[in-house]
A protein has these predicted regions:
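Catalytic active-site module of serine/aspartate enzymes centered on a nucleophile-bearing elbow/loop
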Residues: 252, 256, 260-288
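Alpha/beta-hydrolase fold nucleophile elbow
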Residues: 117-129
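Short beta-strand/loop motif that positions the catalytic acidic residue
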Residues: 211-212, 218-220, 224
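Short, surface-exposed "cap/lid" segments of acyl-processing enzymes
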Residues: 29-76
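Alpha/beta-hydrolase active-site loop
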Residues: 92-116
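Short alpha-helix in the alpha/beta-hydrolase fold that links the catalytic acid
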Residues: 56, 214, 228-237
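N-terminal cap/lid segment of alpha/beta-hydrolase-fold proteins
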Residues: 1-36
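Hydrolase active-site cap/lid region
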Residues: 142-191
């Protein structure tokens, strides 16, 4: 297998320096010296996820071994601490919003284009899981220049809480979300609810799907226990004719069999990786 090299750093929003975005870049060995640049893929986790969760390091490694550069990030509202593996920043999680996710993607993209040593801006792609899938679709549609999108188990809307929950959330000033993996109870404040209600048009995932010019692959498990297959089907139906493909993996769950800590690739994850990397290779050719 080809070797890879990694770089980790933190970006801060200029107008809100308390909002930190942790970034991990992984490319082929010596990628920084490649003449003409290499394709870059922005990778975004989902809700309660992070860039070192489960399959993400393996996904990053596979991208790099394929001759591309993976740019993974923890959103400023992920709640992940300095150790990059613990959801210890409760205040950041409390103030998370979908719009902040989009701003984080913009911040990383801007840094990449202005400071990346070997970025070929004609060969950019995005890859997101779950909530991250919906966010990268919104981001890609707005930017308009991504050559490929990969959405794993994507949400099709941001209004994910029922009316009763939203009313109680507004009344109590927060909603509590259990973390089945860690046993933590995460609190989310009104910023997220305000964002959902005030920025509905900007956060319209299906509307963005209908407008996107980016070739889009959707991979979804038929037994996804977190996001229904109907979400993927509705996104696929909204995409302009011929611009999207839906790959349904029979019996696969939301994380394609992956756990945290990572225990290796099973059949479902291998299938998801194979079809996704093929999509990238077709739309981000290694030679112009």
């Amino acid at each position: 297998m080809a070797g890879t090299q990694q770089t980790n750093f933190v970006l801060r929003h200029p107008r809100a320096p308390e909002r930190r975005v942790q970034v991990r870049i992984e490319g082929p060995e010596g990628y920084e010296d490649v003449d003409g640049g290499l394709p870059h893929v922005l990778v975004l986790h989902g809700f309660k996820g992070f860039m070192h969760w489960g399959f993400f390091p393996e996904l990053s490694r596979r991208i790099a071994q394929g001759g591309m550069v993976a740019v993974s990030l923890n959103t400023s509202g992920s709640g992940v601490g300095d150790d990059l593996k613990t959801l210890s920043e409760e205040e950041a999680f409390f103030r998370c919003t979908f719009s902040h996710d989009l701003e984080d993607l913009d911040l990383v993209r801007q840094h990449l284009l202005e400071n990346g040593p070997c970025v070929d801006r004609t060969r950019l792609a995005v890859w997101g899981h779950s909530r991250g899938g919906g966010m990268v679709l919104l981001h890609a549609e707005r930017c308009g220049d991504y050559k490929a999108s990969v959405l794993w188990g994507p949400i099709n809307r941001v209004k994910i809480f029922d009316e009763e929950t939203r009313l109680r959330w507004r009344e109590e000033g927060e909603v509590q979300i259990p973390n089945g993996r860690t046993g933590q109870i995460h609190r989310i404040g009104l910023d997220l609810l305000d964002d959902i209600e005030e920025n509905a048009a900007r956060l319209d995932i299906l509307g963005a799907a209908a407008r996107t010019l980016t070739p889009t692959l959707i991979v979804h498990g038929s037994a996804d226990e977190a996001v229904p297959l109907s979400d993927a089907e509705s996104i696929h139906a909204a995409l302009p004719q011929g611009s999207g493909k839906l790959c349904v993996l029979p019996g696969a769950g939301h994380t394609f069999g992956a756990k945290h800590p990572f225990e290796g690739c099973g059949e479902d994850l291998e299938a998801a990786l194979e079809v996704s990397l093929d999509h990238l290779q077709r739309h981000l050719p290694l030679s112009n």
